[in-house]
Swiss-Prot record:
Belongs to the DapB family. NAD(+) binds at G9, F10, K11, G12, K13, M14, D35, G89, T90, T91, A115, P116, N117, F118. The keyword Ribosomal protein does not apply. This is 4-hydroxy-tetrahydrodipicolinate reductase. It catalyses: (S)-2,3,4,5-tetrahydrodipicolinate + NAD(+) + H2O = (2S,4S)-4-hydroxy-2,3,4,5-tetrahydrodipicolinate + NADH + H(+); (S)-2,3,4,5-tetrahydrodipicolinate + NADP(+) + H2O = (2S,4S)-4-hydroxy-2,3,4,5-tetrahydrodipicolinate + NADPH + H(+). Keywords: Amino-acid biosynthesis, Cytoplasm, Diaminopimelate biosynthesis, Lysine biosynthesis, NAD, NADP, Oxidoreductase.
């Protein structure tokens, strides 16, 4: 039996890529799409909804969310309330929101996934960076994205820093008496690590994790040149969450 999928934010670039992926997979069935600004009632024969409240009694298994940080939390909560296992690529969640959604998913006996990045290479980058941080505590992150991205730093950069912080010796990167001649020049501070965000047209999603040590350096980098790079992870997420009973944060938990 096919997994019935709703895609919220289907008009965006990630939403469109997800729609095409679902439509071409015989194990998946795209049963509805959601966008508050869509004027048509159907898209390729699939019903279009403008208000998520109208989906409250809809029959579906998985809610895929590529919307905006402003509505991602309430969308994920709505999905869990109505029996849809959420697969969320929208970023901007706080740690408190993630913890609350995990707990709520357990009470609903539903699986779910919030993933800062669905590219398998990005997941591997985070794992490699975590291993390296044990031996190279001096580290900075540079994340680069298209200029339409609304949150900074990226969810991937934050997740990378969180994972490294669990392993890394907590030290302040840079000179103790350094002075920023322009505010923000050294980037965001996460447990002594610096995170720098670049936003430029032409980019998709890229990240470097740069480690330094006496007389040597190590650079890890991942590049997504096309949004199709995320679809393997989205597909995996859809097929895995229906087997689970708790929401997880990070694609690595499903690998």
């Amino acid at each position: 039996m096919s997994i019935r999928v709703i895609i919220a934010g289907f008009k965006g670039k990630m939403g469109q890529a997800a729609c095409q992926m679902v439509l071409t997979d015989p194990d998946l069935d795209l049963v509805a799409v959601l966008d508050p600004f869509e004027s048509e009632s159907e898209w390729q024969g699939i019903p279009v909804f403008k208000d998520k409240a109208d989906l409250a009694c809809f029959e579906a298994d998985v809610w895929v969310d590529f919307t905006t940080p402003a509505v991602a939390y309430e969308n994920t909560r709505f999905a869990l309330e109505n029996g849809f296992a959420p697969v969320v690529g929208t970023t901007g969640f706080t740690s408190e929101e993630i913890a609350e959604l995990k707990e709520f998913s357990r009470t609903q006996d539903l699986g779910g996934l919030i993933a800062p990045n669905f590219a398998l290479g990005a997941v591997l980058l985070m794992q490699f960076a975590t291993q390296a941080a044990k031996y190279f505590p001096n580290v900075e992150i540079i994340e680069l994205h298209h200029d339409k991205k609304k949150d900074a730093p990226s969810g991937t950069a934050i997740k990378t820093a969180e994972l490294m912080a669990e392993i890394r010796e907590s030290i302040q990167q840079g000179a103790a008496d350094e002075e920023e001649l322009i505010a923000g020049a050294r980037g965001a501070d996460f447990d002594g690590m610096r995170i720098h965000s670049v936003r430029l047209p032409g980019l998709v999603a890229h990240q470097e994790v740069i480690f330094g040590n006496q007389g040597e350096g190590l650079t890890l980098r991942h590049d997504s040149y096309d949004r199709i790079s995320f679809m393997t992870g989205v597909n995996l997420g859809i097929k895995e969450v229906v087997k689970r009973h708790e929401l997880v944060y990070g694609l690595e938990h499903l690998l």
